Amino acid sequence: MTINWFKYASPASFYFLAGRMIPYFSIAAIIFLIVGLYIAFFSAPTDFQQGEAYRIIFIHVPAAWMSMFLYVVMAFWAGIGLAFNTRLSSMVASAIAPTGAMFTFLALWTGAWWGKPMWGTWWVWDARLTSELILFFLYIGFMSLQAAIDDPRRADKAGAIIALVGVVNIPIIYFSVQWWNTLHQGASVSLIQSPKMATAMLSGMLIMALAVWMYSIVMILIRARLIILERERHTAWVSELKEGVLE
Amino acid sequence: MIWWIIKRDLLLAMRRRSDVLTTLFFFVIVVSLFPLGVGPEASILRIMASGVVWVAALLASMLSLGRMFSSDYADGTLEQMLLSPVSLSALVMGKAISHWLVTGVPLVLMAPVLGIQYDLPVEALIVLTLSLLLGTPVLSLIGAIGAALTLGLRGGGVLVSILVLPLYIPVLIFGTGAVEASTAGMGFGAHFSILGAFLLVSIVFSPWATAASLRISMG
Amino acid sequence: MIWWIIKRDLLLAMRRRSDVLTTLFFFVIVVSLFPLGVGPEASILRIMASGVVWVAALLASMLSLGRMFSSDYADGTLEQMLLSPVSLSALVMGKAISHWLVTGVPLVLMAPVLGIQYDLPVEALIVLTLSLLLGTPVLSLIGAIGAALTLGLRGGGVLVSILVLPLYIPVLIFGTGAVEASTAGMGFGAHFSILGAFLLVSIVFSPWATAASLRISMG
Amino acid sequence: MTTGPSPIEMLTARNLECIRGEHRLFSNLSFSVNPGELMFVGGPNGSGKTSLLRLLCGLSLPDDGEIYWNGTDIRKLGVDYRDVMTYLGHLGGIKDDLTAIENLRISCALAGCEIDEDQAADALGQIGLAGREMLPARVLSQGQRRRVALARLLVTRTKLWILDEPLTALDVAAVELIKGILEHNLAKGGMVIMTTHQELVMSTVTVHHLVLS
Amino acid sequence: MTTGPSPIEMLTARNLECIRGEHRLFSNLSFSVNPGELMFVGGPNGSGKTSLLRLLCGLSLPDDGEIYWNGTDIRKLGVDYRDVMTYLGHLGGIKDDLTAIENLRISCALAGCEIDEDQAADALGQIGLAGREMLPARVLSQGQRRRVALARLLVTRTKLWILDEPLTALDVAAVELIKGILEHNLAKGGMVIMTTHQELVMSTVTVHHLVLS
Ligand code: HEM
Ligand SMILES: Nc1ncnc2c1ncn2[C@@H]1O[C@H](COP(=O)(O)OP(=O)(O)OP(=O)(O)O)[C@@H](O)[C@H]1O
Ligand SMILES: Nc1ncnc2c1ncn2[C@@H]1O[C@H](COP(=O)(O)OP(=O)(O)OP(=O)(O)O)[C@@H](O)[C@H]1O
Ligand SMILES: [Mg+2]
Ligand SMILES: [Mg+2]
């Protein structure tokens, strides 16, 4: 019986913890978003080469960063779930996937939108763009595999394997600009070198990145809560929740 | 009766929602692979575009032929179809229609989006889509014959492609031909009428040939 | 033990002699389709050659993934494999090797012949063949993971392509890259070492990941 | 050889022969089954029971001999024969991905008798699957899958039933149930031809035993 | 919880629970099987017999409870357990395209006991397939296919046999044959756990009946 208690307690306590954390992260997301957008559209100077179009960068770059970062986080939690059979981490991984796919799509879309004025075409088959597209397919693969499996335990584990195998793609995306000579911009923000861009631009981008980050956390927590409710619907605490005992 | 078959096959497809999406993704991925293999020069890509999209559609349609009868064969449903008082040709027609609805229609809808990636002009996009709309049902109908003939043979999945691809080729030639004619500023009406003729002929003959093949395979 | 599996799978393939031939025919037909879709200009064809051959090899390999475990699954052999005292990774390695022998090797042997049709110079032909020799086993090994994960899922045949194609793409890029580098007169050694590295990594990890996936799918 | 429709319906086999590979499974096999009669086809494994049943329902052709329904060769009858006959083979024709209800409704529709959701649920309930109607067949037990296939017998209006080992995987209660269903059909003037390795005692009806060897 | 290898070999299940979908098939199920003992698992269709057998052989995990072989959890034993155990499920693992001999040799090799052509032909002869050894399994009758799968029991040297409805599709003679094979294994100190819907009277050995409901 003691073992059972442990097994079921952790998603339950996470459920309530997440519920308490969501408002704070939402507020942070909104604040960062307002400040970031203000800098992006009013404070940052017009670029002398690219005109106003460059302002897409404030969405494009944070979205692209987030898309890769979320994949790594998703693979990490999925891997933990696979290795230690902790159901909560697998649920978190499943909760991350749609947000990750959304940002990948956003990066692709804003990139394409930006490409039209900059390169004169929506799309080129260059290494970074292609590998970002592969990332999108990896997210889709992860989600459709999980959707195709009815048994959640099996879905978690199968998803974990494909997520882990797909991690090889992340360095390929990141380093693609260095490995192949491409049309796409190289990394201009790096921990080792000092930044090459205007401070206002840089700070706007970083703040937008924070906003996107907070937003992701909020979305993931909300989705994780839904997944927990769905998966634990037969347990005592969920039925108590339904009857309002725990409210 | 034919509705029952269509309804059932669509139900089966919907039961795994991913099923419809996956053919589509296969199509998208194949179309996206070529530029990777060939290199990103836009001028070359534009020439290849209609060919690549058509070949990908053809492969996507062919890939899913395996599923058309094989699961019905393995679980004994096909036996029941042969013994059904309903005409086998009608049943077969139903299966071909649902195959087209599940695999062909999504491809037709997706084609313009992919064409944009290859930087095709708007008129070419429209012609490409229409040519697929006329051509993909032919693929499903012809494919049904091949799928029926190779039923129960090991390696059928690949055998079917040998049988079916030669028959697909005329469709491919006139489908891409229409797009090229329109890009070259010539009329594409002739190509469309030929595709239409293919469609009519295959609607008339394919269910009959498929039914006969099924009876032979099950004999 | 691994020999038993290889022997058995080859025996099964030989029992239907058409099986080996059909993958090959598929490959040949796909490669021959493109000039039909794209048009016969030799200069364009030469640029496309390596890409088309590689994509066709990739599709041929992928197409046959469905068969890798599904028949063993359907008739209960896979259950017996999981319960076998022999290490599952070894069994899986055996299956990947026989998959490569049946689908990969014929492609490698056929590639130079097809390359000639596309008017490739001799050096490019050799590089193309060697790149396939290094690359196709990787396709079989990675494919095994996808095939194991989608086991028993409806629409698995297409689902597997979504899972596996993104992972195939790096192999495709470096495989065609080698040919292009050699045509451009640059060294292709770097491409080959990367392909070799892919091969080593997949030999080490794929049997393990596939065995894990099989246990999950059968759980 | 056809002698025009005879007044009573009956299935007649004349001088059937079946050769598989090197083996002559049976030859000179003649029998007839009249309304209300049940025929058990017995014999050891591999003696040709399944092969005979497949001949009788028209799935394969005899190497010699003819099969008549009401005096007309079944090959000539075609659809008319398939209209009055139900065959259930080793394989159930059950789709893993469809629920029990969907499976039943579709297999009935294929057999030319459409039923609605309630009728299907009713039949499944009668055959002991109450509460499992909405489960996909994949998760059903072996015996439950078999029951889904057999449920068709409850709704079909055909006369002649050809059943290949219908009792496989069924528990004792289900065997009784099927016995009842068969008796009901026979009482209505139907005909049943079936194989089974299990004993099945049916006293109230005319029973033929055809033993292949 | 592991108590080190006990002197006698035995299979012990403690407080097993199995949940499928909304249904709790069984819970708090404990039993043990000693050398020379046979356990029949009975119960109506869908009561969880197959599910239990799959737990016992390690193909799936119980929702609660443990299974011990000689006092060690079978999950920890892994290969060592698979070395002493043979499972035959509903599906025979028979390849349509291979001959009976090839099928038998390969399934034995998979089970870790390699046999040569003569041994295989011998085993197939004993189980009543003399003359059919070289036929592809595709053309064998249902009962003959089943016999090919069961022939493994004649050559395996494992102690613990877990058999899911081994008698399906077999004729009376074959049932007797299998009975003999089981008795032989039990006499040697083996253990058998099996399900069946048919009666099988075994007087000379210790028989447990576990009935699920
Ligand atoms: C569909 C098209 C595009 C895709 C898929 C794409 C993808 C990416 C990705 C994955 C990153 C993050 C990588 C990193 O941080 O190193 C990135 C960053 C960036 N992208 Fe794009 N991009 C696209 C189009 C464009 C266009 C058209 C431009 C502008 C000409 C552009 C400019 C940038 C810049 C400036 C960065 C930030 C690089 C840095 O500072 O690290 N991108 N993009
Ligand atoms: N191509 C062939 N060559 C040799 N023998 C064949 C061939 N095809 C079928 N057979 C034999 O024909 C017989 C077919 O028997 P059938 O399936 O009708 O048996 P059955 O009476 O239904 O047996 P069971 O009780 O096992 O279901 C088998 O003995 C099989 O070995
Ligand atoms: N996902 C699920 N949801 C609901 N019920 C399920 C699910 N999976 C399995 N079941 C039920 O679990 C039971 C599985 O039974 P099992 O196959 O072990 O039966 P059995 O005793 O072997 O029966 P049989 O005699 O028919 O072979 C069935 O009653 C089935 O309906
Ligand atoms: Mg039979
Ligand atoms: Mg069972």
From Swiss-Prot, chains D, E:
SMART domains: AAA. InterPro entries: AAA+_ATPase, ABC_transporter-like_ATP-bd, ABC_transporter-like_CS, ABC_transptr_haem_export_CcmA, P-loop_NTPase. It catalyses: heme b(in) + ATP + H2O = heme b(out) + ADP + phosphate + H(+). ATP binds at G43, P44, N45, G46, S47, G48, K49, T50. Keywords: ATP-binding, Cell inner membrane, Cell membrane, Cytochrome c-type biogenesis, Membrane, Nucleotide-binding, Translocase, Transport. GO terms for biological process: cytochrome complex assembly. It is a peripheral membrane protein. It is found in: Cell inner membrane. Its EC number is 7.6.2.5. The keyword Kinase does not apply. Residues 11-213 form the ABC transporter domain. GO terms for cellular component: plasma membrane. Coiled coil: none annotated. PROSITE patterns: ABC_TRANSPORTER_1, ABC_TRANSPORTER_2, CCMA. GO terms for molecular function: ABC-type heme transporter activity; ATP binding; ATP hydrolysis activity. Its main location: membrane. Belongs to the ABC transporter superfamily. CcmA exporter (TC 3.A.1.107) family. The complex is composed of two ATP-binding proteins (CcmA) and two transmembrane proteins (CcmB). Part of the ABC transporter complex CcmAB involved in the biogenesis of c-type cytochromes; once thought to export heme, this seems not to be the case, but its exact role is uncertain. Responsible for energy coupling to the transport system. This is Cytochrome c biogenesis ATP-binding export protein CcmA. It comes from Nitrosomonas europaea (strain ATCC 19718 / CIP 103999 / KCTC 2705 / NBRC 14298). The gene is ccmA.
